[in-house]
Curated annotation (Swiss-Prot):
Organism: Klebsiella pneumoniae subsp. pneumoniae (strain ATCC 700721 / MGH 78578)
Sequence motif: Nudix box, positions: 159-180
Protein name (record): NAD-capped RNA hydrolase NudC
Residues bound to Zn(2+): C98, C101, C116, C119
Binding annotation for a divalent metal cation 1: A158, E178, E219
Cofactor note text: Divalent metal cations. Mg(2+) or Mn(2+).
Binding site for a divalent metal cation 2: E174
Length: 257
């Protein structure tokens, strides 16, 4: 899976270091390896996009290293592969030594895994399951400003799934903890890999059941009901949060217009 890049190799290049992405000119590099001074570097083939290979290279380019969020407006498939590259680069960087015996590890040749020759332990990339839910009450949707979003963006509620918890239980718990309300009629919508740093978002829609909004100030700045045709600043297109909000708006329009 890992090999040395040759002069004629071409495709999309995910050059990553410490969860950063090389973005010369603000774009994901695409083309022949020689044009990006990548010949001779180690590369991992991580997929294909539009008939061309996508490669992950672990390297700090010092200049033009940016965030994956800068390519959020790319096609979802390419964004997903870039996220895969960043997560794999960080996985290999953080698993140089075995967590059980402390001996050096090496990469598997057959799968994305790190192996310990001493104690035979095998490690895989970590994925953190999360829930994200759009809650509707008649013609309004519950939107909140999170403490980590200081840019005025209002979004739906979300949180990590705890050990020994189902996705449905996680929705009920997170909604109650963050807003103080209960929901019903929970429906699965879609999922989205979200490499910030290693989440898998599972998206739901739900209806308001009962309760008054009581904001958890550790998590949220504000939370309120917003009529579907009078919404505040929303998450950018391409995010599953935006998809949930737009789907809820479409349902409200169909019912109230």
């Amino acid at each position: 899976m890992d090999r040395i890049i040759e002069k004629l190799d071409r495709g999309w290049w995910v050059v990553s270091h410490e969860q950063k992405l090389w973005l010369p000119g603000g774009e994901l590099p695409h083309g022949e390896a020689v044009n990006f001074d990548l010949v001779g570097q180690h590369a991992l083939h991580i997929g294909e996009w539009q008939g061309e290979s996508v490669w992950m290279v672990r390297q700090d380019r010092r200049h033009d290293m940016g965030s994956l969020r800068q390519v959020l407006d790319q096609d979802p498939g390419l964004f997903q592969l870039a996220g895969r590259g960043i997560q794999l680069a960080e996985f290999y960087r953080s698993h140089k030594f075995c967590g059980y015996c402390g001996h050096p590890m090496h990469a598997s040749k057959s799968e994305w895994a790190m192996l310990c020759s001493h104690c035979r332990e095998r490690y895989y990339p970590q994925i953190a399951p999360c829930i994200i839910v759009a809650i509707r009450r008649d013609d309004a949707i519950l939107l909140a400003q999170h403490t980590r979003h200081r840019n005025g963006v209002h979004t739906v509620l979300a949180g990590f799934v705890e050990v020994g918890e189902t996705l449905e239980q996680a929705v009920a718990r997170e909604v109650m903890e963050e807003s103080g309300i209960r929901v019903k009629n929970l429906r699965y919508v879609t999922s989205q890999p979200w490499p910030f740093p290693q989440s898998l978002m599972t998206a739901f829609m739900a209806d308001y059941a009962d309760g008054e909004i009581v904001v958890d100030k550790k998590e949220l700045l504000t939370a309120d009901w917003y009529r579907y045709d009078d919404l505040p600043l929303l998450p950018p297109p391409g995010t599953v949060a935006r998809r949930l909000i737009e789907d809820t708006v479409a349902m409200c329009r169909a019912e109230f217009e």
